[in-house]
Amino acid sequence: MEIHVYDIELSTRFRGITRRQGVLFEGPVGWAEWSPFPEYDDREAASWLRAAVEMATLGWPEPVRDEIPVNAIVPAIAPVAASERVRASGCLTAKVKVAERGQTLEEDVSRVAAVREELGPRGRLRVDANGGWSLDEAVVAIAELAQFDLEYAEQPCTSVEDLVELRSLLSRRGVAVPIAADESIRRVGDPLRVRDLGAADVAILKVQPLGGVRRCLELAEVLRMPVVVSSALETSVGLRAGVALAAALPELPYACGLETGSLLLDDVVTKPLRAQAGALSVTDLVVDPEALERTRAGDEMAGWWLERLHRVAALVPEWPQTTGMML
């Protein structure tokens, strides 16, 4: 069974990177993607591989909806470009990246203001700091950005404890902006601490980092808070797992963060998952052999990923038994 390592350029810098790489392979029931970010250690990357095994061998739970509303994704770009991106997306909800290293709060305010103007008063707007603010910075920034009627602020600070304190401080100041937890759920030993400590109002769930669609469904049930399904900047193969999760959740009160395929300048399927009128269809994908060849990583990059896969597979007992693949 062949393993494909892809290397695709991004349309703009995102999360500090300009290219996205990962591994694709076909299992008994379908194609799978494994694309943990390079800085993640092997143990963290193992959860991503468990998700890939699920994609390849189990398929998806029964959907309860055939369309997933999604948000436009706005990187830390200039206000004019931010407006253009939202307009082109056709989405009624937008997520704006803030707290980018090297940028100022004033730049964040200008970007968010431009997006709010583009969306109009009825559009929904959320910001994502990726833990980029200290507690004090988060209080000031969210109080300032609250003027734009935020749906929520995602992962303003890194630690769960800071999120708890932040919610308290904002409440005392009369700043009514809900807090969403992302990294505090997917990059910690106990994702339920967010629930137990009252650290967030909304849970962000990402399939690969959390070990698969079924694991996310179980987690959503015990977290007992509204859920937003987001992507990990994958190709359409990986995005399809996020769509499967969003389609299977009993309730879906928010637009999902699954429109990130628009950040890639290429893809590996015949019809990439892209929003139409602000939504993604729950549909099967066909991997394109020509696209696999076109996006194939160079030898050095491919070697790095295959060596990494070899190490991480040793931590995932399901790998050889369920895929029939020995590394």
Outline where the language-model segments fall.
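Conserved active-site loop/cleft motifs that coordinate metal ions or position small ligands
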Residues: W31, V229, A255-L258, S281-V282
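Hydrophobic beta-strand segments of well-ordered beta-sheets in folded domains
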Residues: L92-A94, V202, P226-V227, P253
